[in-house]
């Protein structure tokens, strides 16, 4: 009996899958297997025992791309070198209810490579019942361990422990390239693909590549056009529940993400992150041709399309072309007459949210854009940009009829209407026509004030 309590090496009691057995698992299941192996090993360290550091044999790596046996054992070996303990007794490796014959039988299967346990789904044989249970739970989808914070369920307690790092804010994994930290190794691996440009997950329908499987799943729903989540207020449909929850903030006005520097609030965390780069002046994306920096990749792409002159989105009604599908969508409302954005003050409708926001300032009198040179205030960012050109005497546009230099495109249009006599803005009450829509709006506002 005393012999059963002698010290042994970790490999004497560890049971691993062969490369053939690992070949039956997809990358996510292989990662879970690795995490379970590492978690079990760390649990052995945590009970205060000791483990011998010698690793006499390491299984050869197979042809699998992710997490071969060799990689798993190398991870365990690295943990061993960080540990100050060196041995653990057999009495700590097994449950108290195990009798000597059960312990002896379990150890003997490792040395003899006997595999008495067969999986019902995969028909593979395993040397230990605990590893027989691993694929059984993977196939059955049983998730008995639930997170108290968010309610998410997991097959294994070790997977739950890894998930709980997200709530605790523990970030053990650091990117060697940019220094960004992550709570899970899988998230670090996905992030590293940003630097390498690797996109291993391909769409079978269009061939588009993605860095992670979840992004591919979202993309595939675009082909299926499946949008099961509907907004009760406006009827807009979404592919995912989290998209619907974000959309609800438009109706409620909730802005939970606040900038610590200037106090500005945002509906989305991504919008806050983008805004914070304005304060840090961090522009990660550079134009190779012109050297101009941008906060995110989308802005760089928009800038490049300006120089290339690409306008792939065409209106079927009038033939007008646009750089972005969102611009085309807004433009089509001109033809359909749809004005989904309504002013609560006066009931006036607009085809875009930016148009409604601009209109709101006529009611509030807000002029949030101030000129540093003369102190003049403006309602819109584009107005102050055009105004600043007056101070620097910059007039990039030229009238084709008279050659007059002008500050902005709207002034150029006004000048051309002077030559042509065109007055496109018409008052519906009196029939009088105006050169600019702004002039008509001013007259209408004065008329309403008199009433």
UniProtKB/Swiss-Prot annotation:
Repeat listed as a keyword: yes
Zinc fingers (C2H2-type), renumbered ranges: 145-167, 173-195, 201-223, 229-251, 257-279, 285-307, 313-335, 341-363, 369-391, 397-419
Any one GO molecular function term: DNA binding
SUPFAM superfamilies, sorted: beta-beta-alpha zinc fingers, KRAB domain (Kruppel-associated box)
Keywords noted in UniProt: DNA-binding, Metal-binding, Nucleus, Repeat, Transcription, Transcription regulation, Zinc, Zinc-finger
Location(s) in or outside the cell: Nucleus
Function text: May be involved in transcriptional regulation.
Family the UniProt entry places it in: Belongs to the krueppel C2H2-type zinc-finger protein family.
Protein name as catalogued: Zinc finger protein 222
Gene source species: Homo sapiens
Gene transcribed to yield this protein: ZNF222
């Amino acid at each position: 009996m005393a012999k059963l309590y002698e010290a042994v090496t970790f490999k004497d009691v560890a049971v691993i899958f062969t490369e053939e057995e690992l070949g039956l698992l997809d990358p996510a299941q292989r990662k879970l297997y690795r995490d379970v192996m590492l978690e079990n090993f760390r649990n052995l360290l945590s009970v205060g025992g000791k483990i011998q550091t010698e690793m006499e044999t390491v299984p050869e790596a197979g042809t699998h791309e992710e997490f071969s046996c060799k990689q798993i054992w190398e991870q365990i070996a690295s943990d061993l070198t960080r540990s100050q303990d060196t041995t653990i007794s057999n009495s700590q490796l097994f449950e108290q209810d195990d009798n000597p014959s059960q312990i002896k039988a379990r150890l003997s299967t490792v040395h003899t490579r006997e595999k008495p346990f067969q999986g019902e789904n995969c028909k593979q044989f395993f040397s230990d019942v605990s590893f027989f249970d691993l694929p059984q739970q993977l196939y059955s989808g049983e998730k008995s361990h639930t997170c108290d914070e968010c309610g998410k369920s997991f097959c294994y307690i070790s997977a739950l422990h890894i998930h709980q790092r997200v709530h605790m804010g523990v970030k053990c994994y650091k990117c060697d390239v940019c220094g960004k930290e992550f709570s899970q190794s899988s998230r670090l691996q996905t992030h590293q693909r940003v630097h390498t440009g690797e996109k291993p997950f391909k769409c079978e329908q269009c061939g588009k590549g993605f860095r992670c499987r979840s992004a591919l799943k979202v993309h595939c729903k675009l082909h299926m056009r499946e949008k099961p989540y509907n907004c009760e207020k406006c009827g807009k449909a979404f592919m995912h529940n989290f998209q619907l929850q974000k959309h609800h903030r438009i109706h409620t006005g909730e802005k939970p993400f606040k900038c610590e520097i200037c106090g500005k609030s945002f509906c989305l965390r991504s919008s806050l992150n983008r805004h914070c780069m304005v304060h840090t002046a961090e522009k990660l994306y550079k134009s190779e041709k012109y050297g101009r920096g941008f906060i995110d990749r989308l802005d760089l792409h928009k800038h490049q399309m300006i120089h290339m002159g690409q306008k792939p989105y065409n209106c079927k009604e009038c033939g007008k072309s646009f750089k972005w599908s969102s611009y085309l969508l807004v433009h089509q409302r001109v033809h359909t007459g749809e004005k989904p954005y309504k002013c609560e003050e006066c009931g006036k409708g607009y085809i875009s949210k930016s148009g409604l926001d601009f209109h709101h300032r006529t009611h509030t009198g807000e002029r949030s854009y101030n000129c540093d040179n003369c102190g003049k205030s403006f309602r819109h960012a584009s107005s102050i940009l055009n105004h600043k050109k007056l101070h620097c005497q910059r007039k990039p546009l030229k009238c084709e009829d008279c050659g007059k230099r002008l500050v902005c495109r709207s002034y150029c249009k006004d000048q051309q209407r002077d030559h042509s006599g065109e007055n496109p803005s018409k008052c519906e009450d009196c029939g009088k026509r105006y050169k600019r829509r702004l002039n008509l709006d001013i007259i209408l506002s004065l008329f309403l004030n008199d009433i």
